[in-house]
């Protein structure tokens, strides 16, 4: 059975490119445009990994990360162009396992 990865990324090109790379590596990938859509799916079917963009409309990636972490220990990677130490620490404190 393939490992399942959920991606929440509002930028279509990034979302589709990341999905394509991961699928080519043999993963099952469900990609979502919003954090809310990812949360709805995750609480119905658990993923093996979650990749979250931090800056999304609606429920942002940090909030999604915190909400996921309250209920699940699934590994979470935060994906963002924000690269300050403050952003990194905020992501880890919200429950992220890694920050790219």
PLM segments and residue spans:
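N-terminal/domain-start alpha-helical segments
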Residues: 1-100
């Amino acid at each position: 059975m393939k490992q399942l990865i959920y991606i929440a990324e509002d930028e279509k090109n990034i979302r589709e490119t990341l999905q394509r790379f991961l699928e080519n590596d043999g993963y099952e990938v469900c990609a979502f445009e919003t954090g809310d859509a990812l949360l709805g799916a995750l609480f119905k079917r658990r993923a093996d990994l979650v990749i979250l963009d931090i800056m999304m409309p609606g429920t942002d990636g940090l909030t999604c990360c915190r909400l996921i972490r309250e209920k699940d220990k699934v590994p979470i990677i935060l994906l963002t162009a924000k690269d300050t130490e403050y952003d990194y620490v905020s992501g880890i404190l919200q429950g992220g396992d890694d920050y790219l």
